[in-house]
Structure formats: C-alpha cells, structure tokens
Amino acid sequence: MKPVQELEKNEVYAVEFQGVSTYYFGEAKPAITNVWLKIPPKSLTLIVGPNGSGKTTLLETLLGLLKPKFGRVKLLGYDVPEQVNVARRMCGYLPQDFMRPPGEPFSVKEIVGMGLASNKPFGKLNENDWLMVEEALNLVGIDDLANRPVGRLSGGQQQKVMLARALVRKPKLLLLDEPFSALDETSRRFIAETLLPSLIEDGCTVVMVSHDVSFKPKGCTMTVRMNSGRIVEVNLR
C-alpha cells in the first residue's frame, strides 16, 4: 500500500500490519483476514466500516490483546506481541466499552491518574504526575469535574474522562475506538476540529475507529474502509 508520506531517515511506521489474520478463541472464521496496512507517524487515520467489520479487532490485535494467527504486527517499531509491553507505554487507548458502574468509588482525577500508573503502584504518583493529570483534564475541558466520583457522571462525561486518561502520558500513538459515541455535537466538534489536529502538530499519531462513514476529523490523512474483516478501500486525504 502506498504510504501517506515518505518516512524520514531513522523514522519507523507507527503501525504496521503485514498479512495479518486474527481469530477469536473457538471461532473457525477469522475476525480480520490478510490485513496489510502501514500508518506513518504524526498522521491521523480514520478506520470506518459497519458494526462487525473488524475495526475493534484491528485495534485489539495491534495492542496485543489478541494474538494474530498469521502475519506480523509492529507497533511503534516494536514486534507484537513479543515487545508489546514496551510499545504500550508510549500509547494511549480509549476503548469502546468505557462506562463505569454507578458505585465506582474513584474520583475523576484518580481515574485519569491511573493512566500514569503502569510503572508504579497506584497511589504513589508524585507532584509532577498530578500536574500531568491536571493538564490532561484541562486539555479535554473537564477540570471542573476533577473531584467528582466518576460513577455519578453522564456517559458523555465519562467518555471525556477516559479520553483524558488516554492522553495523560502524552502518547506517541493515540488509539480511539468510537470516541464520539456518547458525546454531544459541541464536544464532538471540539475534539475533531481542535484537539486531534493539535495532537498531530505536537507529533502524536492518531488512529480512530468509527462506524459513521460520513464523519471525518479535521486533518485526516488516510481513511481505511473495512468490511467482513478485510480492508476493502484506502483513501489518502
């Protein structure tokens, strides 16, 4: 597949799928089939397709949550799943299933702080860590919710909290699975037209999954269309 841009010397693709097929346990039919895809750094890629087309499976395979049966996956230059733990520390991920139960005891800032806790036990974040949490809350526009119990928030507010958690470590790669599903129009437009383009300018790579084929964030450099577990079309810009 033709890349969006030529890589500079010593650069690596943010995402590489080389003939990848992934199966769910006990299933005879692959969830994704013979996927070939390269995503350059500092770009915004939109992956679209109907429900069940393999979009979420693609992200789960990339993060090593599912192991491919065939092919090779590289995440930020690291082999998946062998070196995925190293690569994950440089990634932010907003899953499709983000809702917290009403009885969830943690506050918004504690939930966001968990995004920094991969290398240290939760509760031992230092002053600089909490400043990073505050910055992420401000970035998404939910600093006023910092001390609220997350379980008492609306679905849209919780989705913003989980987006802030994905951003708190200033990731090199941000993976978003249906990030607008619970948001109102104003929030959608802010993220799509202001937040995501600013992340790209700062050197982040964004990969966003959506079933809404009519929606395209500002600055999108590549649209990948999936159907029945296969990539059926790739459009540049």
Question: Where are the regions a protein language model picked out?
Answer:
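Helix-to-loop junction immediately C-terminal to a conserved catalytic motif
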Residues: 63
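Conserved ABC transporter NBD signature motif
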Residues: 71-79, 86-87
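Conserved ABC ATPase "signature" region
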Residues: 113, 127-145
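Conserved ABC ATPase signature
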Residues: 149-153
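Conserved catalytic motifs of ABC-family nucleotide-binding domains
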Residues: 170
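Catalytic Walker B motif of ABC-type/P-loop ATPase nucleotide-binding domains
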Residues: 174-177
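H-loop/switch region of ABC-family ATPase nucleotide-binding domains
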Residues: 210-211
